[in-house]
Amino acid sequence: MIPVKGVAGQNVAVLGLGRSGLSAARALREGGAEAICWDDNPAARATAEAEGFTCRELTKQGAFDGISALIVSPGIAHLYPKPNPVIRAALVAGVPVDNDIGLFFRSVATSEWDEFDTAPKVIAVTGSNGKSTTVALLHHILEHVGRNSQMAGNIGRGVLDIDPPVDGGVVVLELSSYQTDLARALTPDVAVFTNLTPDHLDRHAGMGGYFAAKRRLFAEGGPDRAVIGVDEDEGLFLAGQLSEGESDDRVIRISARQKLSGGAGWTVFARKGFLSEYRKGRQAGSIDLRDIPGLPGAHNHQNACAAYAAARTLGLAPRVIEAAMRTYPGLPHRSQRIAEADGVSYVNDSKATNVDSAAKALSAFKNIRWICGGLEKEGGLEALKGATDDVLKAYVIGREAAQFAMQLDVEAEVCTTMAQAVSRAMAEAGPGETVLLAPAAASFDQYDSFEKRGEDFIAEVTARLNG
């Protein structure tokens, strides 16, 4: 655990008692504060009270008297589309609002670091798609070479639940826009921006606010090194804002769509399955990504570029990084090949919760029986047009399956449930084809999470193959 600094003797309110909220409450208590907790869910309050925390309704008059700060869980709206009443009450009372990420960055460094031979590093990864894979791949690379590494944030453990970093240790964080938007301190040693596509627009009042939330990771003087995906205009702009000129190698530009100029400082790009690194005009490394089983498709090649670049900032050699990549097993629910039978492959990409990530998943396979649908996100399905050339047929799930199906430019069958979609896709699939779950939508109309949706897909496929 990382005890929170500077809160001894204070009363600090905590809103939201899920994983990050309870983690923050524990770390505040470890730092000498009294955590005053609230969650609208009685079961969540009961869990907190069982750990000895005080729960108190925070919208009542005077609720913030004597409270020094409010710590908010990432799933709770703090501004758009409308502030949560507790957050608004705190702001009216003049109480600072923060989250566990802000607490982490102000508390992780200790006086013990002065005695270390090599100060620990914090690498933070943000972006619309590929964050989890980039973080998991980088963590795997570090473990493969024997570096002490912990991953946390939007993946793995809560940031305050990790062990205090050791001499030479590395903490790899996945940070969502919800987390970067609210954190009062964001000071990583290396910051990574993978890409930007429309997502969570209701929480950020549009693309401008969404980009601004991501961009905050690179403010406050900026990280020592920045790895920036430049395949979208926002990333290209961000790299330009951070760079002092063509020879500035504090910024590493990465791409999975284009060959980057070797003269532009430090670049890493993937073309036709080959990763190339150029530094100050000379090639410094290359990897053939095509036969790495844990990284299928061009979208994973972008993730490979990001993890490779971050690893290089730590001084790891290209050949060592390549050896580690070849043993990377991949993440569940992200281009996860779950079975192959009678020449048909079954792939679970339930994490493809928006149209951009679904389009990238579709580009990685041929002859696709596509299971899609769910809670459609703002922006519609327009971006999928042109990405479905290899789709033989779509099998649409979700409460609004009929409306979803009407927007597709391929033959589509309304199935509604996962069981029906899997049954129909398996019945019609033949050798050389792939049954792919890539929903292009959120899961919350039918499932608690994308993980539950992916697990349902796996269970349906497995039951039929074993039946």
Swiss-Prot record:
Major place of residence: cytoplasm
Keyword annotations: ATP-binding, Cell cycle, Cell division, Cell shape, Cell wall biogenesis/degradation, Cytoplasm, Ligase, Nucleotide-binding, Peptidoglycan synthesis
Name of this chain's protein: UDP-N-acetylmuramoylalanine--D-glutamate ligase
Pfam families: Mur_ligase_C, Mur_ligase_M
Pathway the protein acts in: Cell wall biogenesis; peptidoglycan biosynthesis
EC number: 6.3.2.9
GO BP terms, alphabetized: cell division; cell wall organization; peptidoglycan biosynthetic process; regulation of cell shape
Record's subcellular location: Cytoplasm
List of residues binding ATP: 127-133
Similarity field: Belongs to the MurCDEF family.
Biological role stated in the UniProt entry: Cell wall formation. Catalyzes the addition of glutamate to the nucleotide precursor UDP-N-acetylmuramoyl-L-alanine (UMA).
Domain of life of the native organism: Bacteria
GO CC annotation: cytoplasm
